[in-house]
Amino acid sequence: MVLILCCTLAILFCVADVNVFHIFLQMSVWRPSEATVYLPPVPVSKVVSTDEYVSRTSIYYYAGSSRLLAVGNPYFSIKSPNNNKKVLVPKVSGLQYRVFRVRLPDPNKFGFPDTSFYNPDTQRLVWACVGLEIGRGQPLGVGVSGHPYLNKFDDTETSNRYPAQPGSDNRECLSMDYKQTQLCLIGCKPPTGEHWGKGVACNNNAAATDCPPLELFNSIIEDGDMVDTGFGCMDFGTLQANKSDVPIDICNSTCKYPDYLKMASEPYGDSLFFFLRREQMFVRHFFNRAGKLGEAVPDDLYIKGSGNTAVIQSSAFFPTPSGSIVTSESQLFNKPYWLQRAQGHNNGICWGNQLFVTVVDTTRSTNMTLCTEVTKEGTYKNDNFKEYVRHVEEYDLQFVFQLCKITLTAEIMTYIHTMDSNILEDWQFGLTPPPSASLQDTYRFVTSQAITCQKTAPPKEKEDPLNKYTFWEVNLKEKFSADLDQFPLGRKFLLQSGLKAKPRLKRSAPTTRAPSTKRKKVKK
């Protein structure tokens, strides 16, 4: 709507010797503002830090795992010839994620020597992770992977001649070392990874040989998933039909990369308390692929050749990655880390009495070669020996936990229920059903065959929502100790926090003897 206001301004001019008055009318038009009007956002519930409703005590506990060992084939799992689902030797590689699911005891069922510090009727106890150390055994080493049939056509780095046309099969046996990665990621929920997979095409008439559309997928990182080795985070088994473009340990696997952006933006901050990361890579060699290009090089990008250069070669170039030197000076492991402030709203609180520790360490990826003798002869023959490849890993997890308490007000319980309703169920809080007003039936002879069976079905156990995922289970429910000074990480924590351990031995009271006085002899 346009409002028009007419304003009459009487302007009088008196002309000398003339009885005339001039009146001028001025019209002004008012229009509303055409700028976009932004309304205030709808108020939403605010996510607060755990420090606002969790009170920390001065009680600390140490917990540590046993020596954790893994042995297997670094390239593939060995399955039973009679049963394809039965794994005889698992795949254990230095390029795999190790996702430890650390189980903690319920502090509300913990036997404390003094329980006067909290009220079990109005408060609940939780654990807070304040320190950890991830120990790594075994020497530093570089693991090598490859493919006996790698799709490598020609060397494009220092070629002194134009290559001939590829034949029907130009695959070669080639090995390489991978990108170097060290990673330590801590949270009370499993880490989230990302990878590129096959998407859905909008055009239903697309041919099967066309380049498939790509889609970024998110998934839980499980124990045994492959890391990014330098060839990208993607589903190689789906996107590479020839199974020859990458080494054999990833040609039928999915390489995942932690989705740091998504975990950092998580509202409650449960998946990522903090992380340590170190990556490095350089390119060692340059090759190109054999095969028919699905997307030819445009004609305006080159001038056609003649003779042996009449047919353009493959432009599908690829490098072989390398992680370079490994050294003890750049190690992230075998040293303590203290959590003072998490990057998210969860400041180290272990909801569900569990902790997820995700580890990647490619600096100890040595593959050991084992050999057995088939036939004993005086001269060396290759057929007289069998070669095997194994990879071993060694871990040690140590933690320092702080006991915390939560006062259960109506507001806090509502907030926790909105965050995760399973927490209140684990604390045995739930809705009490109203008493039934209907008449119940009760039989006299409950074992009689003349009536229906009176056995009540047993209650179903609570199903673990993470049961379908694979993690390395570490049970610390019976490995908590309040004597921090008896363990290496506990002593480091006491030293850096300024706390003192309780004395174990009572010192005896010092005894003092009165000085003896000599009597002087008096001469008579």
Curated annotation (Swiss-Prot):
GO CC annotation terms, alphabetical: host cell nucleus; T=7 icosahedral viral capsid
**Which superkingdom heads the taxonomic lineage of this protein's source?**
Viruses
> Which UniProt keyword terms apply here?
Capsid protein, Disulfide bond, Host nucleus, Host-virus interaction, Late protein, T=7 icosahedral capsid protein, Viral attachment to host cell, Viral penetration into host cytoplasm, Virion, Virus endocytosis by host, Virus entry into host cell
**SUPFAM superfamilies cross-referenced by the UniProt entry:** Group I dsDNA viruses (SSF88648)
Q: Taking the first listed entry, what is the main subcellular location of this protein, grouped into a coarse class?
A: virion
Provide the protein's localization: Virion; Host nucleus
Q: Which InterPro entries match?
A: Capsid_L1_Papillomavir (IPR002210), Capsid_L1_sf_Papillomavir (IPR036973), dsDNA_vir_gr_I_capsid (IPR011222)
One biological process term in Gene Ontology: endocytosis involved in viral entry into host cell
Pfam families per the UniProt record, alphabetical:
Late_protein_L1 (PF00500)
According to the record's subunit comment, the protein's assembly and interactions are: Self-assembles into homopentamers. The capsid has an icosahedral symmetry and consists of 72 capsomers, with each capsomer being a pentamer of L1. Interacts with the minor capsid protein L2; this interaction is necessary for viral genome encapsidation. Interacts with protein E2; this interaction enhances E2-dependent replication and transcription activation.
Question: What is the documented function of this protein?
Answer: Forms an icosahedral capsid with a T=7 symmetry and a 50 nm diameter. The capsid is composed of 72 pentamers linked to each other by disulfide bonds and associated with L2 proteins. Binds to heparan sulfate proteoglycans on cell surface of basal layer keratinocytes to provide initial virion attachment. This binding mediates a conformational change in the virus capsid that facilitates efficient infection. The virion enters the host cell via endocytosis. During virus trafficking, L1 protein dissociates from the viral DNA and the genomic DNA is released to the host nucleus.
Tell me its family.
Belongs to the papillomaviridae L1 protein family.
Tell me the protein's name.
Major capsid protein L1
The upper taxonomy is:
Viruses, Monodnaviria, Shotokuvirae, Cossaviricota, Papovaviricetes
Q: Which gene encodes it?
A: L1
